[in-house]
């Protein structure tokens, strides 16, 4: 018996240049395992697996090959649920886009607009900003992961301006001295001192982003050579290796300054997560992650990219929040609507479009149950094997298998393997 409310999906993949190569990529392995017609090319990158209704790469029903958009449109009340339809004003699209990313080379340093700025940018430049939505996003590590996330604490940036001559040369003595002499530590977020700190940080960032090409390249080259030949001349122990590694990928790039020197270098272990708010700068460096985001493709880029860089909008739009790296990491909470033998936790960012559940099993056998959620969801198996039962049918779940589950459908997960792990993106109104 087939079900209209629970079925397997085929997810498309993207072969962006920064993806892991061939079968070293989780994206490639998931795509090939779930669809035997996919033959992995060991010379090509496999960067992203897309699960959802985004028009660029919509998922399709595994059996019928109908797009998820068309399936939702024919039965939106039952599959999406009236409350979610009313909130997000769509009968054939999900408000989130669910992905797996396999990262070999650093992605562009970027930020995403909020809703207000998204509308403005789309109206003014639809070629570079293809929709009018915001794009907050969350990343959950499934292997060891590195990224840049948010500005470093100001005292770290001030110390770098004093001890890294190439950074100071790019920023210039006047702005460097103004920053070092006037920033304040330990101030309240809502205070005028905090607002002044952000203005000082913006000045430094703008100087980096608008530095003349010859000055930038000379100093980037000099800093990379010094990091390689004399790493002990840097105070931070991991900075020289990072500069050398990223300079190999993008030689003499502005990202060596606006990324390596100004943004937090964040390392996650599997299961740890980051939430990246609109207007906060970030970049993924390496690793495999589950990613969920509001369904948008708007990106304002700064560095480590051959693509369009919108420096003016980027400098103006950022929040210039600055926090230690520990504050960027997001913790999960136990999900109260799950039971049985599995452990189900929820990553619940402070936005309406999505949350993500992770279900694991500590023992080789057992079943986990999850009550019907008040909105649509997409599940992917990332490790191990088992079964998922819902709406009167039981389907095999293996790495890379993707499923859609309609609103208000209770689910049972059964493990046949101690490593059986699923991630489930969902929305409720």
UniProtKB/Swiss-Prot annotation:
One of its GO terms (biological process) is GDP-mannose biosynthetic process. InterPro entries: Man6P_Isoase-1, Mannose-6-P_Isomerase, Pmannose_isomerase-type1_CS, PMI_typeI_C, PMI_typeI_cat, PMI_typeI_hel, RmlC-like_jellyroll, RmlC_Cupin_sf. It comes from the Eukaryota. It catalyses: D-mannose 6-phosphate = D-fructose 6-phosphate. PROSITE patterns: PMI_I_1, PMI_I_2. Its main location: cytoplasm. The active site is at residue 301. Gene3D superfamilies: Jelly Rolls (2.60.120.10), Phosphomannose Isomerase, domain 2 (1.10.441.10). Zn(2+) binds at residues 110, 112, 137, 282. Its EC number is 5.3.1.8. Pathway: Nucleotide-sugar biosynthesis; GDP-alpha-D-mannose biosynthesis; alpha-D-mannose 1-phosphate from D-fructose 6-phosphate: step 1/2. Pfam families: PMI_typeI_C, PMI_typeI_cat, PMI_typeI_hel. It is found in: Cytoplasm. CDD domains: cupin_PMI_type_I_N. Transmembrane segments: none annotated. Its cofactor is Zn(2+). GO terms for molecular function: mannose-6-phosphate isomerase activity; zinc ion binding. One of its GO terms (cellular component) is cytosol. Keywords: Cytoplasm, Isomerase, Metal-binding, Zinc. The keyword Zinc applies. Belongs to the mannose-6-phosphate isomerase type 1 family. NCBIfam families: manA. Involved in the synthesis of the GDP-mannose and dolichol-phosphate-mannose required for a number of critical mannosyl transfer reactions. This is Mannose-6-phosphate isomerase. It comes from Candida glabrata (strain ATCC 2001 / BCRC 20586 / JCM 3761 / NBRC 0622 / NRRL Y-65 / CBS 138) (Yeast).
């Amino acid at each position: 018996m087939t079900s209209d409310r629970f079925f397997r999906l085929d997810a498309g993949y993207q072969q962006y240049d920064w993806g892991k190569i061939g079968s070293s990529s989780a994206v490639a392995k998931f795509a090939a395992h779930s669809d035997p017609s996919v033959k992995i090319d060991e010379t090509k990158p496999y960067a992203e697996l897309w699960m959802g209704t985004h028009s660029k790469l919509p998922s399709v029903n595994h059996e019928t090959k109908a797009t998820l958009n068309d399936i939702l449109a024919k039965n939106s009340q039952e599959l999406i649920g009236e409350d979610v339809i009313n909130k997000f004003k769509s009968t054939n699209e999900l408000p989130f886009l669910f992905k797996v990313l396999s990262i070999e080379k650093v992605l562009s340093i970027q930020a995403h607009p909020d809703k207000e700025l998204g509308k403005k940018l789309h109206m003014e430049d639809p070629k570079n900003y293809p929709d009018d939505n915001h794009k907050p996003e969350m990343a959950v590590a499934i292997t060891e992961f590195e990224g840049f996330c948010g500005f470093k604490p100001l005292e770290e940036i001030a110390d770098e301006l004093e001890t890294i001559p190439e950074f100071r040369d790019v920023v210039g003595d006047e702005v460097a001295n103004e920053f070092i002499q006037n920033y304040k530590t330990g101030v309240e977020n809502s205070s005028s001192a905090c607002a002044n700190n952000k203005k000082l940080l913006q000045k430094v960032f703008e100087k980096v982003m608008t530095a003349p090409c010859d000055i930038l390249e000379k100093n980037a080259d000099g800093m990379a050579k010094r990091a390689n030949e004399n790493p002990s001349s840097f105070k931070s122990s991991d900075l020289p290796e990072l500069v050398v590694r990223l300079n190999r990928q993008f030689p003499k790039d502005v990202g060596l300054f606006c990324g390596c020197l100004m943004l937090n270098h964040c390392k996650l272990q599997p299961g740890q997560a980051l939430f990246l708010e609109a207007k906060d700068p970030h970049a993924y460096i390496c690793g495999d992650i589950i990613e969920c985001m509001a369904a948008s493709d708007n990106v304002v880029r700064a560095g480590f990219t051959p693509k369009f860089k919108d420096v003016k909008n980027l400098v103006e739009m950022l929040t210039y929040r600055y926090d230690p790296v520990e504050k960027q990491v997001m913790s999960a909470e136990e999900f109260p609507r799950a039971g049985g033998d599995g452990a189900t936790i929820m990553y619940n960012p402070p936005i309406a479009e999505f949350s993500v559940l992770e279900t694991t099993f500590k023992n080789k056998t057992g079943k986990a149950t999850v009550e019907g959620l008040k909105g649509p969801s997409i599940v992917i198996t990332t490790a191990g094997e088992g079964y998922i039962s819902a709406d009167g049918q039981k389907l095999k779940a293996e790495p890379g298998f993707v499923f859609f589950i309609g609103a208000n459908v209770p689910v049972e997960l059964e493990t046949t393997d101690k490593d059986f792990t699923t991630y489930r993106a969902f929305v409720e109104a």
